[in-house]
Amino acid sequence: MTMLDTVQHHSQPQSGVPQNHLADEFVETLRLAVPMMLTQLGQIAMITTDLALIGRLGEDAVAAAALAHTVYFVSFTFGLGLMAAVSPLVAQAFGAGDVRRIRRALRVGLWVALLISLPMMASPLYGEHILIALGQVPQSAALAQRYLNGLAWGIAPALGFIALRGMMSAVNRPQPPLWITVAAIPVNAALVYVLIHGLFGLPELGLFGAGLATTLVNLGTFLAVLAIAAWRKPFSDYRPLAHLWRIDWPLVRQLIALGAPISSSLLLEYGLFSSAALLMGLISTTALAAHQIALQVTAVLFMVPLGIGMAATVRVGHAFGRNDPAAVRRAGLVAAVLGVALVSALTVAIILGRYELGRLFFGGSEASAATVELTATLLLVGATFFIADGLQTIMGGALRGINDTRMTLAFAAIGYWCVAFPVAWVLAFHTGLGAVGVWIGFSIGTFVYAGLLVLRFRMLARRLVG
């Protein structure tokens, strides 16, 4: 079997259903999406474990870790967007049966991950100065810096892991990153605990130890997935590490052109939700607490459309690579229908259990009754937001599959900052709706964003068919 035959063999659907049937598209999308969802949930599990173990150091440590994550994730989000461009580039090459381009796209992704990680480390390593400049208490900023000093060095391997995960998903093999992430969860918990408290003769490192543990786990997961890519079939058939020293500058420019708008869109979204916390803080402490818990529920729910959106990138990219416009349209449609159906079902479950979710975090005491009530109200108001946010995530993924990210950035600016934030401000402070007004505003803005993405995909899909 030749290298081209290998690619074409692995590109075939794993079911026996003909490829041009909608049922097959549903199966293939789910087969890709489920491991991606679980991998993302695994990442959340590690972050949650870190915070739980840091919580044993006291409230000051938890507050410092929250500040540190704010600084870290602003920087990391930029790299995340660039690495998200690896998947569509590989998917298109895979659809076209171009082994060499698969290898080149991954190689460029790894080089870009390394090169951008160096300037990206500046923000975490100078996090204390940034936090003080933003008005944070110097003691909290100093504590946050300890955590960041350990965390910053894990940026490069974390980005490398994302690039390799994107390549594996794009060649229809998303399982290895999931296995590695699941294995890393207990390892991460043990390592964080040992380094925080200084067991087995090691020094007690506190917050620095928690950050260092995350860096070591990032390095370990990257090396594990790199080893699988290099030596395990079908990945080894693509010779992913061949000529690794060569930098393909035209492809670097293409990756940056595709990924930079993704990074900017993610930063606009991150900025919106950061501003939401500020708005809630202006309303009341109860509003801020209820908002944070509602967002935690949203974050878990978000993994479903995120996984489907990643799968949409791959499925649309495959069709685009093999020059099959009808399949491009079908892949986007199926992903949207599947995502909206699943998110709608989960949204109904959240609405029915909204009070129980509030009590899970705040307990059932009279003192927390008002916070539980507001949390339940926000989750009810958020029903439209959940569905719209899921749809925009999926359609954004589908558009990446056909290399359309610049208009997505423009739509994000319109939906988030021209609609969501102004409407949230007016409803919260000029109509007396308070926290509920913020969520209504965000729901309206996200709905506008999702609608624009749907129209954009339909227009481009029709243009491809035409």
UniProtKB/Swiss-Prot annotation:
It is a multi-pass membrane protein. Coiled coil: none annotated. One of its GO terms (molecular function) is transmembrane transporter activity. One of its GO terms (cellular component) is plasma membrane. The keyword Cytoplasm does not apply. Keywords: Antiport, Cell inner membrane, Cell membrane, Ion transport, Membrane, Transmembrane, Transmembrane helix, Transport. InterPro entries: MATE_fam, MATE_MdtK, MdtK-like. The chain crosses the membrane at residues 68-90, 110-132, 142-164, 177-199, 209-231, 251-273, 288-310, 331-353, 368-387, 407-429, 433-455. Multidrug efflux pump. This is Probable multidrug resistance protein NorM. The lineage of its organism: Bacteria, Pseudomonadati, Pseudomonadota, Alphaproteobacteria, Hyphomicrobiales.
